[in-house]
């Protein structure tokens, strides 16, 4: 059909309604559609590559939906990297479920929002307050997870009302404080007695039995029980030692004075003997010599009296020992040495010192064994549903995150 002829009419258009060689489409019969502008409703529409400016360039699409020529787009058989200088719309919608290529290139110099920074190398577990904790708080994901013990417990935190918080062990899932919420659905977890026994056999730990060690015996009670006895022995021994020290000191002093006095008396005796020999040979001329001799004799008598008093005091120390006041509670009635002359004999003193040394040589008080007290769980365990024992296989399919087939 010649589209350059001067005029068309209805009969012309109806005569050539569809030319398969020209791919011409006619709508209502009154409008002529250019084949380049027509859309085949039965086919997917692809833009004509010959209408692009660069017919040889491969056109990928960037993040803003605009086509980028070859220098921005890579080979379509390889990973596609967007234009790094592309404008980032801050209000653009980001699909939270979008696929993230784990091997994608991460620009190390990219700007990091300090309010949204997350350590890409950290393993993120979730603590009791629902916040993610990095590696130092979370354990290996292949092991049991322990929450951060120092985690902040928000008192106003939202708690799932369908968690079993009831203390009733027979409460079904969704019962809160014995107030029934939704009816338990047909898909609620059932655990048969066989499963329960298998779980118990596989995953349970034996009950902890307290085994008393030797250092757990109440040494402290025994020691404090006898402490009063040994305190009394100790004070009495110290008093006895002080008295003996004083007696030894006074006896040594008395012995020194006796030695000194005896030496002086020897000299005086020799002098008097010499004077007597001289007086026997010569006649007394005056009373002065006799007075001097009388004064010397009086002085000598006073010294002898003093010396005898000192010796008497030493003998009194030896003859009259101290009288001990015993508390009958602290005296062993089987030890007769306590009642010999009402004093401590050397044997009983030796026994007491030996007991005190034995007491001091015993092992000191050990701290008690630290047992780990189990901490309460955040959520109650799953309730158990009683089922009749049926000799059949377990229903196939996954049950939660358990390991059963």
From Swiss-Prot:
The keyword Membrane applies. Residues 40-172 are annotated as: 12 X 5 AA repeats of D-P-N-Q-A-Y. Sequence repeats lie at residues 40-45, 75-80, 83-87, 89-93, 95-99, 101-105, 107-111, 119-123, 140-145, 148-152, 154-158, 168-172. It is found in: Cell membrane. The N-terminus is blocked. It is a peripheral membrane protein. Keywords: Cell membrane, Membrane, Repeat. Residues 7-25 have a biased composition (Polar residues). GO terms for cellular component: plasma membrane. Residues 1-58 are annotated as: Disordered. The penta/hexapeptides repeats form a proline-rich acidic domain. In addition, a part of this region contains a perfect direct repeat. This is Proline-rich P65 protein. The lineage of its organism: Bacteria, Bacillati, Mycoplasmatota, Mycoplasmoidales, Mycoplasmoidaceae. The gene is p65.
